[in-house]
Amino acid sequence: MMRDPATRGVFGLPTTAAAGGRALRRVQLLVTAVALGGIAQAIAAEPREHLHLAVNLRGDYSGAASAGFNLADVSTQSALKALPEGMRGIYWLGNGYNLHCLWQLSDRQVTDTVMAVKDNPKFSGIYYISDEPHPALCPDAPQRLAERTALIHSLDPRGRTFVVVLNGSAAPTEFAQLKDAADYIGVDPYPCNVRNEVAGCNYAALRERIDQALRAGIPNTRVVPVFQTFGQACTSAGRNYSPYYRLPTLAETKTMLAIWDEKVPVKDRPFDMAYSWGRQPTVACPTLEMADGSAHPDLRSFYTDYFARMKGASPAR
């Protein structure tokens, strides 16, 4: 191919076939490399949007958004459409392999859902596929979750799957068994309960649960911190248990978040999650929605400030 010797190269420098042209081109390449390197550094230095998930909103999207949450769990397209500006949905695909060893939604239903939402601008690209699956009860749970993740990836290559793993004392190998079953693994230790109301939350147990996930081979970039923002003092009389968990105080919340920040730094985590924003009559009450400083500690303002401070954090590499 013949080129005009007066053709302009990068940054307007002329390229010629005359003596010294090769040296000039080397200078051009060097200048280009330096410029691109500077651009790459500038992009890397730009703070990314940190993502915060609120669950059980019961339609209170604006309330959660005002507290700094920019992700909401949704299970219908109408809920996705109702999200306010700046908030995106994590799509709940129904539970599976938790209390029953099957999926609530069939592969066909999941396929239809993924195809319907994957390009929606209000969708985050994250699919919540199971909440606390138990391989001890359902030995094929790791395989079935991995298959569902593979199905979603085949339909939405940019999509990511999310599962919360308990890994409690009764089943301490769940992290190891489920670490490859989904893209993001939620870790949900709830260290504040009625037994330690005087002594304070069990921070050692919180640290140990996080360490268990990391030792199982789940990197920080896949760990989703699940913050305790609920108690059970006002759950309904219809429950079949005695209330155990209690809403953390402001001081306890500060300590818990400091531990999370140490173990799973803000710059690494894909997003974080608060359980729970809204009440669940037999499971969670009071919750973050209620913790506004009136009858309960003002955890809402505390989380608003915590999220605001993240905006200057460095992006994940």
What are these language model-derived features?
Residues M1-L24:
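N-terminal secretory signal peptides that target proteins for export/translocation
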Residues A17-A18, R26, S169, E174:
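Short, well-ordered helical secondary-structure segments
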Residues A23, V31-A33, S236:
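Amphipathic, positively biased hydrophobic alpha-helical segments used for protein targeting
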Residues Q28-G38:
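Bacterial N-terminal signal peptides
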Residues I39-A44:
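Sec/Tat signal peptide C-region and signal peptidase I cleavage site
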Residues A45-R317:
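Glycan-processing catalytic domains of CAZymes
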